[in-house]
Regions:
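Conserved catalytic core of nucleotide polymerization and phosphodiester-bond processing enzymes
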Residues: 1-305
Length: 305
């Protein structure tokens, strides 16, 4: 950050959520939900009181862990549903640590309430990541509409193919001893799953860039004389005497990757080369580019932990 200290985006989002909770103490109302009875009759009924929810969450208090996983997984395809699930897990962890549940035995409803605020706060903070995710999903959907798998090359030159097939449930009757059993098997079809192609592209694309960074960092470090590595995804390990060399190499590789490659433009071109001329006209434009000076990464003490 500008003051020379590690920037904590999880804390930033948590603070925004706390601000929203304080606002709701004055402006909150009754949130309703629609239920359907056994006869198919729909009925609107009260779900929760926003003022009461806000007061209890403020009394419980939010730390950076309240938003950490929700923010962390966003570039990997995080959704509102996963946001709610992680919020409930956070609440359960707090309760397991000795906190008293202001809602009795209920952890679902308060997680629904808070996750909506967290999701909005993430959207106000991590704007570019959400735009990029939507861009990738649109491209994957267009390719899938022509039954085309998505393929691209990473900055390290590695080819990547994403092809999630549709499935059909097949029920099998079998006998085990004296019992008749029915098993359901998922049979792969020749058609592509459009929903899985879209939902999978964001995490797979980001993981492919992580893999490229790891590959290029090892290649770079080998040229600097480092020959022992313990590498898992985005966790880089070398002998202590080589740590300073590794720190320089991984920063240099990151800068070169994103200085020499417009990864979103390259991905868009890869899709354009696959689809028909008619679909090419429907490809979304590139998301706007920010003003980050990528070379500043070389001077960042806290870029990589």
């Amino acid at each position: 950050s500008a003051d020379g200290k590690p920037a904590d985006i999880y804390r930033v989002v948590a603070d925004k959520v706390t601000g929203k909770l304080r606002d709701l103490l004055c402006t909150g109302g009754i949130v309703t939900k629609v239920t359907t009875n056994s006869k198919g009759v729909k009925k609107e009924e009260p779900y929760y009181d926003e003022k009461d929810m806000a007061r209890k969450w403020l009394e419980l208090g939010l730390d950076r862990k309240a938003t950490k996983r929700q923010v962390m997984v966003l570039p990997y395809g995080g959704t509102q549903q996963s946001c709610r699930e992680y919020t409930e897990e956070y609440l359960k962890d707090r309760l397991a640590g000795g906190a008293e549940n202001p809602w009795g035995d209920d952890t679902f409803t308060p997680s629904v309430f808070l996750s909506r605020l967290i999701w909005d706060a993430i959207g106000e903070t991590v704007i570019a990541a959400r735009d990029a995710m939507a861009f990738l999903q649109k491209l994957a959907r267009i390719a899938a509409s022509e039954e085309l798998p998505v393929n691209w090359r990473t900055p390290a030159g590695m080819p990547v193919l994403q092809a999630y097939p549709d499935h059909k449930a097949r029920r099998v009757k079998t006998k085990l001893g004296d019992s008749i059993m029915y098993l359901t098997l998922q049979e792969e079809l020749e058609t592509l799953s459009k929903s899985r192609q879209a939902s999978g592209i964001s995490p797979n694309f980001v993981h492919s860039l992580d893999a490229a960074a790891l590959q290029l960092t090892i290649h770079n470090a080998l040229k600097e004389g480092v020959c022992e590595f313990a590498m898992v995804h985005d966790s880089y390990g070398v002998p202590a005497q080589d740590a300073a060399i590794m720190a320089k190499c991984l920063r240099r590789v990151f800068v070169e990757m994103f200085r020499d490659h417009d990864v979103l433009a390259e991905f868009r071109q890869a899709i354009s080369d696959l689809v028909s001329e008619d679909k090419q006209k429907k490809l979304p434009p590139l998301p706007p580019v920010g003003d980050l000076n990528i070379n500043l990464v070389l001077e960042s003490d806290f870029f990589f932990a």
